[in-house]
Swiss-Prot record:
Monomer. Interacts with OAZ1, OAZ2 and OAZ3; this interaction disrupts the interaction between the antizyme and ODC1. Does not form a heterodimer with ODC1. The N-terminus domain is necessary for its localization to the ER-Golgi intermediate compartment (ERGIC). One of its GO terms (molecular function) is arginine decarboxylase activity. Keywords: Cell projection, Cytoplasm, Cytoplasmic vesicle, Golgi apparatus, Membrane, Nucleus, Polyamine biosynthesis, Pyridoxal phosphate, Transport, Ubl conjugation. It comes from Homo sapiens. It comes from the Eukaryota. This is Antizyme inhibitor 2. It is found in: Nucleus; Cytoplasm; Cytoplasm, Perinuclear region; Membrane.
Length: 460
């Protein structure tokens, strides 16, 4: 079918055959390869992304999803999301070029970085990208000079003190400073059309969204009073991408819907969208990593046995990827990755205190420690799930690693859902609700039943 994604872009997974099965085949093939060089690789379930999209539309029907390109800019991800009709949130010139290269129109792109280089602003102006964010006077001055026709979105600060990744110290203007910026924009004939915020990643309190929406309402009133035509509300990101998150996406959506009904009721003429990254891709990616070396370290008390029956030693495993690459979440998000063994150990196998280390020659490249694992060997593969966010393209040439290869997969059911999506966009007809599992992943067993597929229109 015509569109951004074609069948040649992925492996079609038939019913009864999961991406876990595909991953096993790929690790077996890698182990049997004649070359002695092995490399970690991803398997990406594009069907899981399709399923997440329909879940989003069901839970937040008034909100247009925009994808945060910085989270995972791999071609398969961009193409499937483009096929689904998403807009794209770009942080720099390279990301704007990337999405325009696959055919995304400028009207579906927002340059959401409040602090941009002049070259990035000029690129947006030259290529018709109108929607830009800002949070300071210097940014306004750059826009006046390089892109005077831009439609600006004022980024406000939020209370993200409980988030794992806080952004308000770096980005966002306080409420008391908003009027001054809005007046400055009016003085220089810069059009401000809306408000954005970002509560940070891993926020455990959904009410942070409600408070930020209430704050945005105040800024809308300031802008309207000063003569700005305010009609864009950007809810930012921070939405969880895994089922095991402290706060479920559905809980956050419920709070957002209530706040929108109160402060931006339906029919108010405001275009609402969100910038989602982790939500779409985290659970869709699984990575296989090879053990490249190991050593056994005896504990201090020879002959001592642990309570679980293991002998008194700890085993150090060296992997071909570490915290300076795809496991950077260990450093930045304080996450301890848990490996999945390709072969399930028997209950009779002893377990040993174990740790996993990356290839860097320093003491900080520890992927995980305090693990209890059976005896593993050089050449064995470890599998890690929920690896889709901020991992792709994270190779480190300094340590001799390259960006990991990605094998994309999708179930036939999900592919047919995409076909219907495209036909709906082309013919402007409603499509049937999708009432079958859309993911070919091994974790997803429930079904999804949603109404007509929503295709975002131009943001301008």
């Amino acid at each position: 079918m015509a569109g951004y994604l074609s069948e040649s872009d992925f492996v079609m997974v038939e019913e009864g055959f999961s991406t876990r099965d595909l991953l096993k085949e790929l690790t077996l093939g890698a182990s049997q390869a004649t070359t002695d060089e092995v490399a970690a690789f991803f398997v990406a379930d594009l069907g899981a992304i399709v399923r997440k999209h329909f879940c989003f539309l069901k839970c937040l029907p008034r909100v247009r999803p925009f994808y945060a390109v910085k989270c995972n800019s791999s071609p398969g991800v961009l193409k499937v999301l483009a096929q689904l009709g998403l807009g794209f949130s770009c942080a720099n010139k390279a990301e704007m070029e990337l999405v325009q290269h696959i055919g995304i129109p400028a009207s579906k792109i927002i340059c959401a970085n409040p602090c941009k280089q002049i070259a990035q602003i000029k690129y947006a102006a030259k290529h018709g990208i109108q929607l830009l964010s800002f949070d300071n006077e210097m940014e306004l001055a750059k826009v006046v000079k390089s892109h005077p026709s831009a439609k600006m979105v004022l980024c406000i600060a939020t209370d993200d003190s409980h988030s794992l990744s806080c952004l308000s110290l770096k980005f966002g203007v306080s409420l008391k400073s908003c009027r001054h910026l809005l007046e400055n924009a009016k003085k220089h004939h810069v059009e401000v059309v809306g408000v954005s915020f970002h509560i940070g990643s891993g926020c455990p309190d959904p009410q942070a969204y409600a408070q930020s929406i209430a704050d945005a309402r105040l800024v809308f009133e300031m802008g309207t009073e000063l003569g700005h035509k305010m009609h864009v509300l950007d809810l930012g990101g921070g939405f969880p991408g895994t089922e095991g998150a402290k706060v479920r996406f559905e809980e956050i959506a419920s709070v957002i819907n209530s706040a929108l009904d109160l402060y931006f009721p339906e029919g108010c003429g405001v275009d609402i969208f969100a910038e989602l990254g982790r939500y779409y891709v985290t659970s869709a990616f699984t990575v296989a990593v090879s053990i490249i070396a190991k050593k056994e370290v005896l504990l201090d008390q020879p002959g001592r046995e642990e309570e679980n029956g293991s002998t008194s030693k700890t085993i150090v495993y060296h992997l071909d990827e570490g915290v300076y690459g795809i496991f950077n979440s260990v450093l930045f998000d304080n996450i301890c990755p848990t490996p999945i063994l390709q072969k399930k150990p028997s209950t009779e196998q002893p377990l040993y205190s174990s740790s996993l280390w990356g290839p860097a020659v320093d003491g900080c490249d520890c992927v995980a420690e305090g693990l209890w694992l059976p005896q593993l060997h050089v050449g064995d593969w470890l599998v890690f799930d929920n690896m889709g966010a901020y991992t792709v393209g994270m190779g480190s040439p300094f340590w001799g690693t390259q960006a990991c290869h990605i094998t994309y997969a999708m179930s036939r059911v999900a592919w047919e859902a995409l076909r219907r999506q495209l036909m709906a966009a082309e013919q402007e007809d409603d499509v049937e609700g999708v009432c079958k599992p859309l993911s070919c992943g091994w974790e997803i067993t429930d079904t999804l039943c949603v109404g007509p597929v929503f295709t975002p229109a131009s943001i301008m």
